[in-house]
């Protein structure tokens, strides 16, 4: 699933040549062409430090460490985004499935998918996000 045919215009307009220079090949394929990194290979799958996870393309803060949980799926999982305005959700009918794709609402970068099998004592949602779509900014617990 590529973003090439999308009709939504995002506030942050990306220059493809600049993105290819700045991002790793995996980051580019994940964020720009909705690729998925292999399970259990992502940099942030097991990260437990306090901080904020930001979009690797535009640096928009997306998730905080307090919403992260171990789902066992092989990708970083969160029960909610930082707020309701940072995420864009689209129906994804690729690979013979119907899922909800999650994108950065500022630049349109593909992040992953959201499923309804998250912690029931929280939102019940599991935002399953590719590490390649994120940068982590460590912060002290009390900030």
Swiss-Prot record:
Cofactor(s) this protein cannot do without: Zn(2+)
InterPro entries reported for this sequence: Met_Sox_Rdtase_MsrB, Met_Sox_Rdtase_MsrB_dom, Mss4-like_sf
Keyword match Transcription regulation: no
Domain of life from the UniProt record: Bacteria
GO biological process: protein repair; response to oxidative stress
Protein residues bound to Zn(2+): 55, 58, 104, 107
Domain MsrB per the UniProt entry, residue ranges: 16-139
Any Pfam family the entry gives: SelR
Catalytic activity: L-methionyl-[protein] + [thioredoxin]-disulfide + H2O = L-methionyl-(R)-S-oxide-[protein] + [thioredoxin]-dithiol
One cellular component term from this protein's GO annotations in UniProt: cytoplasm
Active site per database record: 128
Keyword Zinc-finger attributed: no
Co-factor binding comment: Binds 1 zinc ion per subunit. The zinc ion is important for the structural integrity of the protein.
GO molecular function, one term: peptide-methionine (R)-S-oxide reductase activity
Enzyme class, broadest EC rank: oxidoreductase
Enzyme Commission number(s) of this protein: 1.8.4.12
Keyword annotations: Metal-binding, Oxidoreductase, Zinc
Listed PANTHER family: METHIONINE SULFOXIDE REDUCTASE, METHIONINE-R-SULFOXIDE REDUCTASE B1
Family recorded in the similarity comment: Belongs to the MsrB Met sulfoxide reductase family.
Designated name of the protein: Peptide methionine sulfoxide reductase MsrB
Protein's organism: Burkholderia vietnamiensis (strain G4 / LMG 22486) (Burkholderia cepacia (strain R1808))
């Amino acid at each position: 699933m590529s973003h090439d045919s999308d009709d939504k215009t995002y506030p942050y307009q990306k220059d493809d040549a600049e993105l290819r220079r700045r991002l790793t090949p995996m980051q580019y394929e994940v964020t720009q062409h909705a690729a998925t990194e292999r399970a259990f290979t992502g940099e942030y799958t097991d990260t437990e430090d306090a901080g904020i996870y930001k979009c690797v393309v535009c640096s928009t803060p997306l998730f905080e460490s307090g919403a992260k949980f171990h789902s066992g799926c092989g990708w970083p999982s969160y029960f909610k985004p930082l707020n309701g305005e940072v995420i864009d959700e689209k129906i994804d009918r690729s690979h013979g499935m119907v899922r909800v794709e999650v994108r950065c609402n500022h630049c349109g970068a593909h992040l992953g998918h959201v499923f309804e099998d998250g912690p029931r004592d929280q939102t019940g949602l599991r935002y399953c996000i590719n590490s390649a779509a994120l940068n982590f900014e460590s912060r002290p617990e009390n900030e």
